[in-house]
């Protein structure tokens, strides 16, 4: 059986270059730039997902629990949310947070679709990809400027002893392996701690390779480490929106100018 390192190195061109096509960016962009102002009372999660899909025009697929998919999400879970003007992506995540699922659930972009289900279902072997994270800039040793080398620049005249360039005892530099392992610990401690095989999980694996890290895992984990592997298209005539990553949540933030413009339009539309 091929190890993760052998598999990743053998297929480096296929797995490490962006594999996602433009359809992935287009699908997510529809959820970012479509606003939905709807509240829900005891609405099934399936109905909420269907509304988001129809309103945004994106293909949002609920991978529900079934005989062939025992780890899928329970489509009959209900959602209670007050009406609020929010991007469709935020509504999707708010609905997942409000549905009361007994197991963690999330979403990911794959093959031009937004897939919604439990984290377990979205982490099956067929859902996983391998990506390489360059870490050169993170593991460069930082000089100790409080203990500079003695250049012996003082004194003058012939017959001096000359300037040595002593660099201290050499213990100020940590070796590459130590710094790399420290970075791995930081990653698995802060990004989905229960996902990593190193920590007893089953969803993601991370291992060093020279001055990079090989990470194999589902897309919803990969985006927390390296972001999306596709570009988000600009929407003509729209103020650009930003994304804020907060764990497995990706929140859409609307510029203040756009919010004020919408409020002005709403006031103008009210009868006087």
Q: Which residues does each predicted region cover?
A:
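Bacterial N-terminal signal peptides
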Residues: 1-15
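Outer membrane pore-forming secretion/assembly proteins and partners of Gram-negative envelopes
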Residues: 9, 16, 20-272
């Amino acid at each position: 059986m091929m190890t993760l390192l052998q598999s990743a190195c053998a297929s480096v061109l296929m797995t490490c270059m962006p594999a996602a096509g433009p359809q992935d960016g287009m699908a997510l962009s529809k959820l970012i730039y479509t606003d939905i102002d709807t509240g829900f009372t005891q609405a099934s999660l399936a109905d909420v997902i269907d509304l988001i899909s129809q309103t945004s025009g994106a293909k949002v697929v609920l991978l529900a629990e079934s005989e062939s998919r025992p780890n899928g999400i329970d489509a009959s879970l209900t959602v209670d949310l007050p009406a609020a003007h929010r991007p469709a992506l935020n509504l999707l995540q708010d609905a997942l947070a409000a549905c009361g699922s007994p197991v963690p659930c999330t979403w990911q972009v794959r093959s031009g679709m937004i897939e919604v289900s439990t984290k377990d279902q979205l982490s099956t072997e067929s859902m996983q990809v391998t990506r390489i994270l360059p870490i050169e800039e993170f593991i460069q040793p930082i000089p100790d400027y409080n203990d500079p080398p003695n250049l012996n620049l003082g004194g003058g005249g012939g017959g001096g002893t000359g300037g040595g360039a002593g660099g201290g005892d050499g213990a100020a530099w940590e070796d590459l392996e130590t710094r790399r392992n420290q970075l791995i610990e930081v990653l698995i401690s802060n990004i989905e701690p229960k996902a990593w095989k190193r920590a007893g999980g089953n969803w993601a694996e991370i291992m060093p390779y020279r001055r990079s890290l090989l990470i194999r895992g589902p897309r919803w984990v990969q985006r927390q480490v390296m972001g999306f592997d596709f570009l988000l298209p600009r929407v003509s005539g729209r103020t650009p929106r930003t994304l804020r990553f907060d764990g497995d949540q990706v929140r859409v933030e609307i510029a203040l100018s756009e919010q004020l413009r919408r409020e002005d339009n709403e006031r103008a539309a009210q009868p006087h």
